[in-house]
Amino acid sequence: MAASRLDFGEVETFLDRHPELFEDYLMRKGKQEMVEKWLQRHSQGQGALGPRPSLAGTSSLAHSTCRGGSSVGGGTGPNGSAHSQPLPGGGDCGGVPLSPSWAGGSRGDGNLQRRASQKELRKSFARSKAIHVNRTYDEQVTSRAQEPLSSVRRRALLRKASSLPPTTAHILSALLESRVNLPRYPPTAIDYKCHLKKHNERQFFLELVKDISNDLDLTSLSYKILIFVCLMVDADRCSLFLVEGAAAGKKTLVSKFFDVHAGTPLLPCSSTENSNEVQVPWGKGIIGYVGEHGETVNIPDAYQDRRFNDEIDKLTGYKTKSLLCMPIRSSDGEIIGVAQAINKIPEGAPFTEDDEKVMQMYLPFCGIAISNAQLFAASRKEYERSRALLEVVNDLFEEQTDLEKIVKKIMHRAQTLLKCERCSVLLLEDIESPVVKFTKSFELMSPKCSADAENSFKESMEKSSYSDWLINNSIAELVASTGLPVNISDAYQDPRFDAEADQISGFHIRSVLCVPIWNSNHQIIGVAQVLNRLDGKPFDDADQRLFEAFVIFCGLGINNTIMYDQVKKSWAKQSVALDVLSYHATCSKAEVDKFKAANIPLVSELAIDDIHFDDFSLDVDAMITAALRMFMELGMVQKFKIDYETLCRWLLTVRKNYRMVLYHNWRHAFNVCQLMFAMLTTAGFQDILTEVEILAVIVGCLCHDLDHRGTNNAFQAKSGSALAQLYGTSATLEHHHFNHAVMILQSEGHNIFANLSSKEYSDLMQLLKQSILATDLTLYFERRTEFFELVSKGEYDWNIKNHRDIFRSMLMTACDLGAVTKPWEISRQVAELVTSEFFEQGDRERLELKLTPSAIFDRNRKDELPRLQLEWIDSICMPLYQALVKVNVKLKPMLDSVATNRSKWEELHQKRLLASTASSSPASVMVAKEDRN
């Protein structure tokens, strides 16, 4: 199938409709010489400042003077192009040009536009949150190596500009970009309309209706209506006024296109500051009368009507003669505008009844088109506002650490949303205080303000007069105290406004909108204020609603930033406090030197390899030397290259970080470590466990109860302590013990693991955590069933990691409960210490928490100790040591001691039962009575 051939005109039309494709092609295929020629030609074209020569055949009508006093025909349009040439004999249509610029619109279906999909944009949005370093060119490419350096550099810069990763804000903007485009239908040419007017009025009328029905842009629609009305009634000038302020009850007739000449070929430039607007008060003049009463006014001689205002004629020199004014209604009959035709052509003729009928037929269609365009404009405005609010949220989440930065972003967004001259944010000094006092003020002026206003603003800020006015602003104080927004349309007419301060500042305030800023707890933390809309109008209800919605997000952002600042200060205080505590929690240099120089007794002298070691045989210093001996005896100092001075310092600091509680103190930690050492050396576990595992369990034993407070995990949960809030209610204390051990290791001069390899260090810290957490009896109950089954079935395998983990956990528990394996006198003494500590916890539960403690913590039930010890041994201790004996028979002396101690507790329990029975018998009661007598 042969490809269709395109002529140059079709290609040019296609590129006009799709400029992004042309730009893409130029960026990829354009040459430097082409760009230089383009720059040279256009710089020459812009060099002459004189008027351009007029086009041949331009009608005299195109050179007539409009009421604004400017030439219509002989200049250039907004884009610098000359006006189009009218049809010869164009007087038939009142001198209307052939094809004005708005007639050259094209159907933009957008099918060939290159757009990133929503999915890809979302991915880019997520990727932009991370920091990437991208190379924007391929270092291996050498095809352009022969080009001049300037050209290579220029190409690299172009690539860099187009390939750098976009910011989060840009990607969000692309994601929120509206995919709804205004349909653009090219209207029929004016000369064709003139032809239809002469030969087929019905078709002529339908063409005019069709052209406005397809236009949803209010500006171009208004301009079309003016031109078409001029064309229909042969008027020299035409104006269109639209009703504004109906919702607020203050109607005004506003026209951005006033007295448009029928021969104007281009759509006039609209001013961003609405300098071309003409406002007519409701009910004033002929326009206001028609708008208020809805009547048609047809005046042959305007100067004979008392309602006519000739001020415009005096200013422009244009004389108004005949005038036809008619209301424009919406589909429900509401007046939404007024159309005015001036000076019937030929000059001096009045507008006829036929003109009135034609306008009456055409304006209802105009009303429908205007209503649709206004509805579309309102929806676009709401979309832009919603989009702006989402961008505000993005700004707030991107910056939550610096109050000044986030407030500046807020003020910049507020100015963009509300198009105001100034924006202020004032923050309260104390949100809890009933007295309103602002402590901080932030001010931003719009860049669209005049230079004089900006200079006045800078001078007032330098003199601090305006800052003082902000801090002592009575309107802001009122809003902060009542929590209600204030919207003042005319500041000088409002008694709440301080006019003197306004005059001193040199900035004239016309309108004020001030709303409170709330935090997440619905407390007022400040106020936000905007002044003077750029268009000169007061802030309306829509502005107020938008500003209040905007300030909700701003309040959350400011509150988060303030909270971050408070957390940052708290963190700094905590760092200082920890620094002070770590200084006092570490041992002194004299202590380290003392043990560093001391002679360490042998294992046999200390008897630390005995399973039945006396827990109370060594004093606090002797326990340090014994711990040093254990490290040396196990070969850990040599194997892991532990600095001896560091080891001494670490042991002394660990001892110092145990609290002076009755049982869970340094002596208990040492005794647990001693029993682990004895089991490793006596039972031969030293040959089964790796050196890293041995180091982990020895260090774990010494650190397993660091900073113990004498209360258990259940008490932490019941009391809602800081530890429970920090670590949760699962193994609360054990997590704290591990973290405390890590803190000591990370302190300067305490890292006994400093010479380990990276892998050894990582493995060791994981094993250390497992060892300390294993002392939680909850975890013991979870894992012991599996351990017992493995042992009873003979399926235990030292090569399986999970089996080794379970075994180490059981060893830690066996050592932690090891007092029950000691001789009776030692075991009983330890049991009494544990019970005393439990009783102190029970007393706190009763006094502080108003709870009745369980039997083991209840001092009033201390005589039940033997029974409780029997339950303890039978349910927890005995099964564990029985299983360990099955693993290694050398541990049988421990099991025998448990059985012996159980029999002792059984004897005490039986004696208590006999005593209880005897005290409750009748004979004992009689004996007691006789004793009393």
From Swiss-Prot:
<feature type="modified residue" description="Phosphoserine">
    <location>
        <position position="162"/>
    </location>
</feature>
<dbReference type="GO" id="GO:0047555">
    <property type="term" value="F:3',5'-cyclic-GMP phosphodiesterase activity"/>
</dbReference>
<dbReference type="GO" id="GO:0030553">
    <property type="term" value="F:cGMP binding"/>
</dbReference>
<dbReference type="GO" id="GO:0007165">
    <property type="term" value="P:signal transduction"/>
</dbReference>
<keyword id="KW-0479">Metal-binding</keyword>
<dbReference type="GO" id="GO:0004112">
    <property type="term" value="F:cyclic-nucleotide phosphodiesterase activity"/>
</dbReference>
<dbReference type="Pfam" id="PF01590">
    <property type="entry name" value="GAF"/>
</dbReference>
<protein>
    <recommendedName>
        <fullName>Dual 3',5'-cyclic-AMP and -GMP phosphodiesterase 11A</fullName>
        <ecNumber>3.1.4.35</ecNumber>
        <ecNumber>3.1.4.53</ecNumber>
    </recommendedName>
</protein>
<feature type="region of interest" description="Disordered">
    <location>
        <begin position="42"/>
        <end position="125"/>
    </location>
</feature>
<keyword id="KW-0378">Hydrolase</keyword>
<dbReference type="GO" id="GO:0010754">
    <property type="term" value="P:negative regulation of cGMP-mediated signaling"/>
</dbReference>
<dbReference type="InterPro" id="IPR029016">
    <property type="entry name" value="GAF-like_dom_sf"/>
</dbReference>
<keyword id="KW-0021">Allosteric enzyme</keyword>
<keyword id="KW-0677">Repeat</keyword>
<dbReference type="GO" id="GO:0046872">
    <property type="term" value="F:metal ion binding"/>
</dbReference>
<keyword id="KW-0963">Cytoplasm</keyword>
<dbReference type="InterPro" id="IPR036971">
    <property type="entry name" value="PDEase_catalytic_dom_sf"/>
</dbReference>
<dbReference type="InterPro" id="IPR003018">
    <property type="entry name" value="GAF"/>
</dbReference>
<comment type="similarity">
    <text>Belongs to the cyclic nucleotide phosphodiesterase family.</text>
</comment>
<dbReference type="GO" id="GO:0004114">
    <property type="term" value="F:3',5'-cyclic-nucleotide phosphodiesterase activity"/>
</dbReference>
<dbReference type="InterPro" id="IPR003607">
    <property type="entry name" value="HD/PDEase_dom"/>
</dbReference>
<feature type="domain" description="GAF 1">
    <location>
        <begin position="217"/>
        <end position="370"/>
    </location>
</feature>
<dbReference type="InterPro" id="IPR002073">
    <property type="entry name" value="PDEase_catalytic_dom"/>
</dbReference>
<dbReference type="Pfam" id="PF00233">
    <property type="entry name" value="PDEase_I"/>
</dbReference>
<dbReference type="GO" id="GO:0019933">
    <property type="term" value="P:cAMP-mediated signaling"/>
</dbReference>
<dbReference type="InterPro" id="IPR023174">
    <property type="entry name" value="PDEase_CS"/>
</dbReference>
<feature type="modified residue" description="Phosphoserine">
    <location>
        <position position="163"/>
    </location>
</feature>
<feature type="binding site">
    <location>
        <position position="424"/>
    </location>
    <ligand>
        <name>3',5'-cyclic GMP</name>
    </ligand>
</feature>
<keyword id="KW-0140">cGMP</keyword>
<feature type="active site" description="Proton donor">
    <location>
        <position position="664"/>
    </location>
</feature>
<dbReference type="InterPro" id="IPR023088">
    <property type="entry name" value="PDEase"/>
</dbReference>
<keyword id="KW-0597">Phosphoprotein</keyword>
<feature type="modified residue" description="Phosphoserine">
    <location>
        <position position="239"/>
    </location>
</feature>
<feature type="binding site">
    <location>
        <position position="705"/>
    </location>
    <ligand>
        <name>a divalent metal cation 1</name>
    </ligand>
</feature>
<comment type="function">
    <text>Plays a role in signal transduction by regulating the intracellular concentration of cyclic nucleotides cAMP and cGMP. Catalyzes the hydrolysis of both cAMP and cGMP to 5'-AMP and 5'-GMP, respectively.</text>
</comment>
<dbReference type="GO" id="GO:0005829">
    <property type="term" value="C:cytosol"/>
</dbReference>
<feature type="binding site">
    <location>
        <position position="816"/>
    </location>
    <ligand>
        <name>a divalent metal cation 1</name>
    </ligand>
</feature>
<feature type="binding site">
    <location>
        <position position="704"/>
    </location>
    <ligand>
        <name>a divalent metal cation 1</name>
    </ligand>
</feature>
<feature type="binding site">
    <location>
        <position position="668"/>
    </location>
    <ligand>
        <name>a divalent metal cation 1</name>
    </ligand>
</feature>
<feature type="binding site">
    <location>
        <position position="705"/>
    </location>
    <ligand>
        <name>a divalent metal cation 2</name>
    </ligand>
</feature>
<keyword id="KW-1062">Cushing syndrome</keyword>
<dbReference type="GO" id="GO:0004115">
    <property type="term" value="F:3',5'-cyclic-AMP phosphodiesterase activity"/>
</dbReference>
